[in-house]
Amino acid sequence: MIALAYLATVAIAAMVLAVALRRRPTPTNPPAPAPAPALAAVDGGAEIRVILAATHQLAARLSTAA
């Protein structure tokens, strides 16, 4: 009797596994990344000038706040 219950349990587990494997979605490749936007040609020192201007402006605000 115990052997019959064991065999029934194994059969049910095998069916559950078969259904789970059959319903598993197939793996797909991820979509290709979008092309990177072209960077505008900028002057080599433009970035440092913007940073320096922002630093100067912040320092001016902090000096008047104190």
Swiss-Prot record:
Keywords assigned by UniProt? Plasmid
Q: Where is this region: Hydrophobic?
A: 1-20
| Highest taxon, organism lineage | Bacteria
User: What is the name listed in the Swiss-Prot or TrEMBL entry for this protein?
Assistant: Uncharacterized 6.6 kDa protein
